[in-house]
């Protein structure tokens, strides 16, 4: 364990909660930051608050509602359908979201004396989001270091693993049941296994089913 402090970009979903448990094992002190950008389901923020409280993690919520003014999308607007047409970005993509989130997380991290930032972005299950790519994160890391003259390190524990491997990681961290029962991934705002129909739920379930099959096979 590093005797240092980390800030986790935290939404209360499967990926960021797995990253939170990862950070707790990696760093002596961990804080979480959640962004309120008027997302479709306010339950996401409530979920993040409850998880942080249960784990005894200091938790900051930042108002990023300006994102909805700049880039209306299906994650913030109930009148927009969740779609993903071939050759186009998904309607759930929010222009500049991870750029802004990581930048503000870095400002917060510096203020609280942390140089490590942890985020659950992932290129393996790449959903067409350009701001989930490794090259983007590495580029932004350099930019943030230059902009604040501060040695930030952005950690992406999930970058090269798929959803099944993310479930495996949560199991290795002793957090499998916690993540399965208490996180919110569903675009329709249903905690745990979700609605089973939206793209996020389908990806989560496919990964879970694959991992459970692998785990069962390994135990036989």
Curated annotation (Swiss-Prot):
InterPro entries with a match to the protein in the record: QueC, Rossmann-like_a/b/a_fold
Catalytic activity of the protein: 7-carboxy-7-deazaguanine + NH4(+) + ATP = 7-cyano-7-deazaguanine + ADP + phosphate + H2O + H(+)
Gene: queC
NCBIfam families to which the protein is assigned, alphabetical: 7-cyano-7-deazaguanine synthase QueC
Cofactor(s) listed: Zn(2+)
The organism of origin for this protein: Bacillus mycoides (strain KBAB4) (Bacillus weihenstephanensis)
Pathway(s) the chain acts in: Purine metabolism; 7-cyano-7-deazaguanine biosynthesis
Any GO molecular function: zinc ion binding
Top-rank lineage group of the source organism: Bacteria
Name of the protein: 7-cyano-7-deazaguanine synthase
CDD domains in the cross-refs: QueC-like
Family per similarity comment: Belongs to the QueC family.
Note on cofactor: Binds 1 zinc ion per subunit.
UniProt entry tagged with the keyword Metal-binding: yes
EC number: 6.3.4.20
Residues holding Zn(2+): 186, 195, 198, 201
Calcium keyword on record: no
Subunit comment: Homodimer.
GO biological process, one term: queuosine biosynthetic process
Keyword line: ATP-binding, Ligase, Metal-binding, Nucleotide-binding, Queuosine biosynthesis, Zinc
Binding residue positions for ATP: 10-20
Role this protein plays: Catalyzes the ATP-dependent conversion of 7-carboxy-7-deazaguanine (CDG) to 7-cyano-7-deazaguanine (preQ(0)).
């Amino acid at each position: 364990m590093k005797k240092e402090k980390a800030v986790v970009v935290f939404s209360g979903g499967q990926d960021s909660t797995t990253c939170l448990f990862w950070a707790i094992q990696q760093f002596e002190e961990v804080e979480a930051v959640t962004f309120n950008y008027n997302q479709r389901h306010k339950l996401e923020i409530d979920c993040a608050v409850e998880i942080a409280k249960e784990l005894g993690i200091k938790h900051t919520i930042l108002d990023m509602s300006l994102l909805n003014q700049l880039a209306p999308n299906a994650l913030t607007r109930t009148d927009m359908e969740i779609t993903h047409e071939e050759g186009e970005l998904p309607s759930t993509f929010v222009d500049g979201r991870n750029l802004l989130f990581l930048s503000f997380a870095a400002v917060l991290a510096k203020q609280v004396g942390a140089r490590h930032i942890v985020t659950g972005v992932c290129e393996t299950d790449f959903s067409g989001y350009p701001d989930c790519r490794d090259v983007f994160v590495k580029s932004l890391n350099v930019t943030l270091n230059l902009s604040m003259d501060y040695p930030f390190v952005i950690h992406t524990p999930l970058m090269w693993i798929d959803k099944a491997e993310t479930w495996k990681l949560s199991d290795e961290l002793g957090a499998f049941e916690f993540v399965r029962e208490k996180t919110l991934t569903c675009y329709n705002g249903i905690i745990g296994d979700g609605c089973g129909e939206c793209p996020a739920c389908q990806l989560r379930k496919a990964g879970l089913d694959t991992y459970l099959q692998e785990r069962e096979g390994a135990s036989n």
